[in-house]
Amino acid sequence: MSFLWSLGSFIIAIAVLVSVHEYGHFWAARKCGIKVHRFSIGFGKVIWKRIDKYGTEFAVSMIPLGGYVKMLDGRNEVVPAEQKSQAFDSKSVLQRSFVIIAGPLANFIFAIFAYWVIYLYGMPTVKPVIESITPNSIAAQAHIEPNTQILTIDGEETQDWETINMLLATKMGEPNVEISLSPFNSNIEQQRTLNLTNWTFDPEKESAFEALGIMPMRPKIEMVLSKVVQNSPAEKAGLQIGDKILKENLTALPWQDFIKQVEQGESFSIKVERNGETFDKVLTPVRNQNGKWFVGVSPALTKLADEYRTELKYGILESLQKGIEKTGQLSLLTLKILGKLLTGDLSLNNLSGPISIAKGAGASANIGLVYFLSFMALISVNLGIMNLFPLPVLDGGHLVFLTMEAVKGKPVSERVQSICYRIGAALLLSLTVFALFNDFLRL
């Protein structure tokens, strides 16, 4: 069921974002008087189509992992004399550049719109209050203390942990990052400076703030079982809701330690407390439908006190402003991470492919529509930036060729473009295969 949910959420997200991107190209082409043959969502066999009064075929194709806009172009077909003025290649460099850049621009506009809707509706979140500081960490060296709330980072307001994570990630390598804090529920401000010159982190394994040693206030996990899955190893071993899992010394077993034992995939013994009595049980993990080891239990969570919770909700104009700011932060973060990948400061193992995106889509959709919309905004920004990358098969590569044409006064030769396209396609395919390989390693 979780696989189908993730797959369905992924298809919806990709279909919407590809439609937005391709509509940007389509809209700009129409504005420039270019004839559009086909607007397709997906590749492969056409499963639905409709032709409008301008002769454009709108189609939905079998493979929902992309899309395209096919325009009248003298480089690819014989153009009738009466239609030459409607061909893409007959337009000025400026007009063609506008058509190319309109796709990524549409993705950024979608992200702004999505965050505008999110902030209008209201997004529940947790205040950025620090629960603890890891000893000898960068945060500890900066004398940041527990039970303080992060107010700003280099002057930018921080109302939630997601914003903090993004801002800190963009500060990687900077020697002086100013953080403003205050003791929780106090008006006294404190200033601290982080030295991030030699700091790097793995975004697949931890958040930026946790890598710095900042542990957020979050719901407490109690080793009292709140759920036992039917026909699971836990139920077969006789575990029940309300059972307390203990260490050998009869103290509570931390949930993370319990998970580590499960992930080893071997039988292990636990002590269980029930109705004042203590006894031993043996659990034998099995693999679930996602290939991960599990025993079929969930712990109870102590609800986070209301004083630590808030809702990000604003008026119409302020929501728009926040949407623009958030999209800008995401764009800067994406560019920084791309830069770190190119310089080797971040491992290419952090690249994610469609499987990771599908899992993220399913998880966010499972939490709620607001979170799914936020996830789509994030992917839309990434899609916009990646398409502007100067690789010949991408929009950015087309813009490079058009820039060279504007400088030289004539188009780049078909032969050079063809060679560049082949190299670009090979590089893009290699990155896609590598990202897929990373996805499989994470399963």
Curated annotation (Swiss-Prot):
- Location within or outside the cell: Cell inner membrane
The cofactor(s) it depends on are: Zn(2+)
Q: Does the keyword Cell cycle apply?
A: no
Q: Name one Pfam family in it.
A: Peptidase_M50
Tell me where in this chain the PDZ domain is found.
106-185, 198-287
Residues forming the catalytic site: 22
Question: EC?
Answer: 3.4.24.-
SUPFAM superfamilies in the record: PDZ domain-like
Is-annotated flag, keyword Nucleus? no
- Indicate how the chain sits in the lipid bilayer: Multi-pass membrane protein
Where do transmembrane segments lie in this chain?
98-118, 369-389, 423-443
**InterPro entries linked to this entry:** PDZ (IPR001478), PDZ_sf (IPR036034), Pept_M50_Zn (IPR004387), Peptidase_M50 (IPR008915)
Give the family, as the similarity comment puts it. Belongs to the peptidase M50B family.
Q: What does this protein do, in the record's words? A: A site-2 regulated intramembrane protease (S2P) that cleaves a peptide bond in the transmembrane region of RseA. Part of a regulated intramembrane proteolysis (RIP) cascade. Acts on DegS-cleaved RseA to release the cytoplasmic domain of RseA. This provides the cell with sigma-E (RpoE) activity through the proteolysis of RseA.
Domains: entry comment: The 2 circularly premutated PDZ domains act to negatively regulate protease action on intact RseA.
The identity of this protein, by name, is: Regulator of sigma E protease
Q: Which organism is it from?
A: Haemophilus influenzae (strain ATCC 51907 / DSM 11121 / KW20 / Rd)
